[in-house]
């Protein structure tokens, strides 16, 4: 597939030690040679080398910058095209000047995600691997980055390709049955083979889907909302979990007037912690906005940490808050155990039933370990599975796998009911196509464009 040559800045904008301008395409080396002055022309250097020299404006012969240029020749590159990377000092003015020179002499500004898109279109990676590149960039924990790296390396792709190959083998048998309907033994053998292989594929899809909940948590983080009356210690809890002081902690009720969010790795579980404004009736306009945002965060939460004050009796406000969350995955935390106990624990247990309860003192940092273990146990049964497993974490992949499972179940039901093989063939083909959408072998151009448009510029 023929493309033009693209260019972009591949490092974050701003002052830094190093800035990189990347070019990819058939004229990458030629454009580089128009700007580069060194011991050798770039066209004469070996592939996968880095070369010292200067960028010079060809129009004025002005030395723009001292650089190191990497030369990477196709096909042993990420895009499977010629690539050069111009490494310069990280000043905004200089790196923009070099970018402008590359465009003046034949390159086009790359679109977001275009390098990865070219890697996909040139067969370097499939669509699920391309999506994993962005997951890796966005990962918030070591575990999430490991899951993404496994997918970049092709673990999910290999599984999907094997399943599609198995379906093709079933379809080949079905074709024999359709072509030679007069042979009963062929029909019997085909039906037996179809059912055996289809059930095996369905079981494999089910195993992948079983990793979906954990995979999605690792990819996106477990959305965890801390809720309770004002001044029960919600922000102190957030600070203890993230070991930071982002939330404002004071003795004034209603201090947290917005939703504060932070990522933290708790016992291998990535949490997206959300500290909310206390939910209560208020006339303060600013606080009222915070309360509404808190209600929205609650409705979207995977886990709710409901905080009570050990120093105060249970109130109607506490009961009202618990009514809002009682049907959700929640942990009740009795905080401030370092203070005099005025809270009736039996009354709390009667209200919350089987909901887990942890007692803590955020001031003395007591009970935090128990809280972390309870979070892990609630969602992972006490066992955060091996990060080397193949996880499905992408919502698009999960949706397609569910559709594929339904389609192959339709094929199984049809075969068991004695429906003609040409009808069964339709469901099998549909399963094959749905699995192909995951790795991009049967994805539409519109879907591909939409997915890559979400990437950052320069990747």
UniProtKB/Swiss-Prot annotation:
K(+) binds at residues 231, 250, 252, 255. Gene3D superfamilies: P-loop containing nucleotide triphosphate hydrolases, Probable tRNA modification gtpase trme, domain 1, tRNA modification GTPase MnmE domain 2. Its EC number is 3.6.-.-. Keywords: Cytoplasm, GTP-binding, Hydrolase, Magnesium, Metal-binding, Nucleotide-binding, Potassium, tRNA processing. GO terms for cellular component: cytosol. One of its GO terms (molecular function) is GTPase activity. It is found in: Cytoplasm. Its cofactor is K(+). GTP binds at residues 231-236, 250-256, 275-278. (6S)-5-formyl-5,6,7,8-tetrahydrofolate binds at residues 22, 85, 124, 459. Binds 1 potassium ion per subunit. Mg(2+) binds at residues 235, 256. GO terms for biological process: tRNA methylation; tRNA wobble uridine modification. HAMAP family: GTPase_MnmE (MF_00379). Exhibits a very high intrinsic GTPase hydrolysis rate. Involved in the addition of a carboxymethylaminomethyl (cmnm) group at the wobble position (U34) of certain tRNAs, forming tRNA-cmnm(5)s(2)U34. Belongs to the TRAFAC class TrmE-Era-EngA-EngB-Septin-like GTPase superfamily. TrmE GTPase family. This is tRNA modification GTPase MnmE. It comes from Staphylococcus haemolyticus (strain JCSC1435).
């Amino acid at each position: 597939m023929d493309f033009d040559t693209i260019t972009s800045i591949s490092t974050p904008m701003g002052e830094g030690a190093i800035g990189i301008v990347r070019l990819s395409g058939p004229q990458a080396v030629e454009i580089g040679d128009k700007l580069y002055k060194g011991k050798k022309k770039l066209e004469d250097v070996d592939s996968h080398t880095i070369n010292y020299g200067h960028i010079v404006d060809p129009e004025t012969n002005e030395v723009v910058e001292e650089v190191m240029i990497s030369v990477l020749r196709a096909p042993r590159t990420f895009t499977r095209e010629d690539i050069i990377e111009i490494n310069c000092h990280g000043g905004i003015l200089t790196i923009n000047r070099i970018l402008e020179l590359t465009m003046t002499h034949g390159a086009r500004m790359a679109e977001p995600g275009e390098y990865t898109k070219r890697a996909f279109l040139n067969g370097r990676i499939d669509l699920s691997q391309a999506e994993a590149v962005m997951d890796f960039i966005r990962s918030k924990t070591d575990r999430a980055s490991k899951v993404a790296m496994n997918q970049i390396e092709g673990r999910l792709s290999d599984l999907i390709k094997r399943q599609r190959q198995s379906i093709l083998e079933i379809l080949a048998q079905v074709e024999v049955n359709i072509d030679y309907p007069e042979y009963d033994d062929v029909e019997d053998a085909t039906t037996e083979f179809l059912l055996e292989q289809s059930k095996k594929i369905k079981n494999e899809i089910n195993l992948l889907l079983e990793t979906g909940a954990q995979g999605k948590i690792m990819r996106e983080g477990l959305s965890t909302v801390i809720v309770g009356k004002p001044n029960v210690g919600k922000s102190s809890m957030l600070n203890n979990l993230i070991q930071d002081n982002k939330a404002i902690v004071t003795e004034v009720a209603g201090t947290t007037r917005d939703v504060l969010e932070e990522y933290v790795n708790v016992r291998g579980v990535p949490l997206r912690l959300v500290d909310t404004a206390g939910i209560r009736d208020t006339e303060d306009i600013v606080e009222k906005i915070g309360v509404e945002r808190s209600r929205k965060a609650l409705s979207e939460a995977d886990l709710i940490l409901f905080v009570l004050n050990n120093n105060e009796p249970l109130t109607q406000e506490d009961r009202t808050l618990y009514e809002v969350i009682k049907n959700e995955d929640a942990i009740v935390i009795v905080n401030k155990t370092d203070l005099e106990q005025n809270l009736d624990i039996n009354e709390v247990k009667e209200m919350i039933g089987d909901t887990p309860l942890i007692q803590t003192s955020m001031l003395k940092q007591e009970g935090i370990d128990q809280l972390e273990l309870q979070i892990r146990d609630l969602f992972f049964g006490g066992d955060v599975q091996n990060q080397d497993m193949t996880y499905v974490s992408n919502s698009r992949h999960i949706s397609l796998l569910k559709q594929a499972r339904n389609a192959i179940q339709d094929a199984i039901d049809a075969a068991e009911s004695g429906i003609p093989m040409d009808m069964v063939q339709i469901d099998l083909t549909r399963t094959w196509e749905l699995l192909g959408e995951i790795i991009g072998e049967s994805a539409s151009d519109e879907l591909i464009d939409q997915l890559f448009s979400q990437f950052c510029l320069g990747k």
